[in-house]
Amino acid sequence: MISVLQDWRELGDCIETLQRDKLPLHSTPQKNWDHFILRKALSQLEPGAPIADLGCGHGLTLEFLRRLGFENLLGIDLSISWRLRAREALTMYRERRLKPPYRILRGSISGSSIPASSISLALSISTIEHGVDVDRFLADTFRILEPGARLFITTDYWGEKVKVSDSIRAFGLPWRIFDRDRISRLLDSAARIGFEPSENSIPACSGAPVVWQGLAYTFIALLLRKPPSRSETHLSNGR
């Protein structure tokens, strides 16, 4: 699956759906598209399936997943913000919990301490554009995924190359906008590592609903799958 946010009309439809279903909205309006698309990728997962948020930031996506009913949640980030810890504490207080609603690890998404073949879905929301070594990230995520599990990625995107000044920093990190060529190379790298791209056709951009630092662009979402084990393949084929 490869999806591109096309315009404000599409974004408005996503927000309306999330509101109707009484799900928490992201503080950045455009990021609600990421969560809307992510929700589709979660449709076949059980509530207890282990899910890892790679680059969890302030925990907004972890909270979204929790509100969807998922119980086995793990977040990893280079720095653990006070906002994330405050959200944990508030949830524990409101729900009279003795344990936090999700586990948080400090570390790199390009070489984590997560055990191999232990995750049913890994996701990375607006993270890889901030100086991440994409090949190392893909390789380590492939390692931690169970056979047949998936990786969901969103990132900043525009079909043509957008020059980003080195002086622009986001969260103290470098920033880039992926173009069609970079996404194609990412998909090629994923295939070499062993992922099965669900779709190779990258949709065209019809609008730029995101503007930051004077640059207009959009978002792209990718869903990649680690192949199932040979025994699982035989079972699915009725052998």
What are the residue ranges of the model-derived segments?
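Conserved class I S-adenosyl-L-methionine
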Residues: 48-57
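Class I SAM-dependent methyltransferase Rossmann-like catalytic core
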Residues: 2, 15-44
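Conserved Class I S-adenosyl-L-methionine
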Residues: 164-196
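Acidic carboxylate diad motif detector
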Residues: 153-155, 159
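A short glycine-rich, Lys/Arg-flanked "PGG" loop and its adjoining helix->strand segment in the class I
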Residues: 135-150
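A conserved beta-strand element that flanks and buttresses the S-adenosyl-L-methionine
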Residues: 123
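Core SAM-dependent methyltransferase catalytic element
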Residues: 193, 201-239
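Class I SAM-dependent methyltransferase SAM/SAH-binding core
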Residues: 60-111
